[in-house]
Each structure stands twice: as C-alpha cells, then as structure tokens.
Amino acid sequence: MEGDCLSCMKYLMFVFNFFIFLGGACLLAIGIWVMVDPTGFREIVAANPLLLTGAYILLAMGGLLFLLGFLGCCGAVRENKCLLLFFFLFILIIFLAELSAAILAFIFRENLTREFFTKELTKHYQGNNDTDVFSATWNSVMITFGCCGVNGPEDFKFASVFRLLTLDSEEVPEACCRREPQSRDGVLLSREECLLGRSLFLNKQGCYTVILNTFETYVYLAGALAIGVLAIELFAMIFAMCLFRGIQ
C-alpha cells in the first residue's frame, strides 16, 4: 500500500512539474513578446522604469521556472532525494519572491495613475529630442497609438521644459500631429497647422485611456497566469516533500 502511494505521489509530482515547466515557458514567451512586440507595448513599458524592470523579472522568472520544472520532472522520475530537496528549496524561494513582487505591485500601484503620468510628462518632456529616452519613448507611444499627451493636447500647455525649448512657438509636439491615413511613411496632414494647435490637424485623444486599455488586456492575462503558477508551485512543493520523505 505504501509503495502504491509512493508511486502515485511520484507521478503526481511529475505532472505538477510538467505544468511548472509549461508555465515557465509561457511566462518566458510573454516576456519575450512584450520586449519585441511591434504594436508599441514595449514603448509603453519603457515609459516607466518600474514596469521595464518588471518585464525583465518576468523573463528571468519564466526561464528559471522552465529549468526548475525540468529539474523536478527528473527528480521525480529518478527518485533522487538530492534533486528533490534542491527543487523544493528553489521553488520555495521563487514562490516567496513572486508573492513579494505581487505585494509590492499592489503597494506601488499609484505609480500608474493619470496624475503620475501627467506629472512626469509636464516635468520631463523635451519634444523632438531623440537623445532623451523619456521624450523619445513618449513620441513613439503618441505616434503608434495616434494620441497626444496623457489627457490630451492641453497637457503641453504646462510642459515647462517643452515650452522653454520651443520658445512657446509650438502648442503641441510633432508627435501629436495627424498623419495621412494611406501613407506608409507617416506623412503629416499639415505640420504647420498642427503645431499651431489647430484641432483638425492633431490627435485629440489622450494616451492614458489607450495605455489603460492595453494594460487591462495584458494585466488580467498575466494575473490569471500568475495565480495558476503560484497554485501549481505550492502543490509541487507539497508533493516534493512527501516524495522526499517516502524515498528510502
């Protein structure tokens, strides 16, 4: 009876580790996709160093889970106590790290508010300065999504650095200008009229709504996946310790 129980635990351990292996592969794939996504999600993430760090953490955690899932499968099949103990300790560390990251994300969620983005834009935006990472990122976001500022074109009335650099000669940056719908090269409808703030020639929608909608799509997916991975890790640790204690 004890042998049957041990055998059952062994196969359950293998199954749960296989799911960890798949979960790690999914996290790794999502992390890679976020970093190379051609639709502009990378630019949105790059606008906030905290989020960019999160993307790299996603890549690292995905790769680590991928390897540990493989390690756990080997430990279960070979019934190696050393591998099982090594697996348990590392899964425990990862589990605690993921839990801590989730708590920190909840605590610092105010960094994603409309007020935060507006404050950063009006304080640091420099217009068409490609050497400034912050400004270049915002320009890329506004061009990609056809939006202007955080709330709309009026944000640039309070962008102190932008106003100083343009000597108040431009109401909005060129990135806010509307482009020819059929143009592959992004030809502007009228650069002069746009920079003067003529509403027919600039994008009036703020980028915050676009960013929020984009994040809602990915955050729910990532959140559901993270909960699933945490649950699998918890069961895997239980099975690993039970199998470890059952092996003579």
Swiss-Prot record:
Residues 1-13, 71-83, 245-248 are cytoplasmic. It holds the Pfam family Tetraspanin. The keyword Phosphoprotein does not apply. GO terms for cellular component: plasma membrane. Coiled coil: none annotated. Glycans are attached at N111, N129. It is found in: Membrane. Belongs to the tetraspanin (TM4SF) family. Interacts with ORAI1; this interaction regulates ORAI1 exit from the endoplasmic (ER), and/or Golgi, and trafficking to the cell surface. This is Tetraspanin-18. The gene is TSPAN18.
